[in-house]
Amino acid sequence: MAKVHITNVVVLDNPSSFFNPFQFELTFECIEELKEDLEWKMIYVGSAESEEHDQVLDTIYVGPVPEGRHIFVFQADPPDVSKIPEPDAVGVTIVLLTCSYRGQEFVRVGYYVNNDYADPEMRENPPTKPLFEKLTRNILASKPRVTRFKINWDYGHINGNGNGVENGHQDEMATDGPSTSEAASAVIHPEDDNSLAMPMENGIKALNENSNSLAMEC
């Protein structure tokens, strides 16, 4: 049984300029004290074609974590535009929030991100070379996908993402955790059984389409 459950995520400052920081307010419940840190990462998927374009925007460590409810704001600088392929600069991509314990990733939350020009004329006739300073970033806050991985909470480090995947329909699945690029595909394709598409009725309440908050019941 997981000892940490994300119960709410609020996307702050959304929509926003491309060069503004990403900001997420995360609420999580810890069912018992954790002696070691939780490792949180924010990852920007630079291209669906290759994982080599992924950028870890920031990594933070939270802990030791006492039992109870905790809230913090995870803020990270925007991606390095020199590492984004020009054909992938404008349009839909993904930002991932992941959490690991003792080197084992146990949950990731993926959001669609749409980067487009605020100027209607530029949307109709986009420049050949992307003008990032003219782009607006819009995170589809009401439609995240959550993937949960079964890990060993009580013992030493285990390589990879654990022994299986948990979701609202299956407690365990005999499969290794996906790579970042595979996880990006999981966010895009709703038929992937290892992810929870939200909003849905299975213990998850989503706010309206224009809301930047997602409430999840554990």
Curated annotation (Swiss-Prot):
GO terms for molecular function: histone binding; RNA polymerase II-specific DNA-binding transcription factor binding. InterPro entries: ASF1-like, ASF1-like_sf. It is found in: Nucleus; Chromosome. Signal peptide: none annotated. GO terms for cellular component: chromatin; nucleus; polytene chromosome; RCAF complex; transcription repressor complex. Keywords: Chaperone, Chromatin regulator, Chromosome, Nucleus, Phosphoprotein, Transcription, Transcription regulation. Histone chaperone that facilitates histone deposition and histone exchange and removal during nucleosome assembly and disassembly. Cooperates with chromatin assembly factor 1 (CAF-1) to promote replication-dependent chromatin assembly. Plays a role in the formation of silent heterochromatin. Belongs to the ASF1 family. This is Histone chaperone asf1. It comes from Drosophila melanogaster. The lineage of its organism: Eukaryota, Metazoa, Ecdysozoa, Arthropoda, Hexapoda.
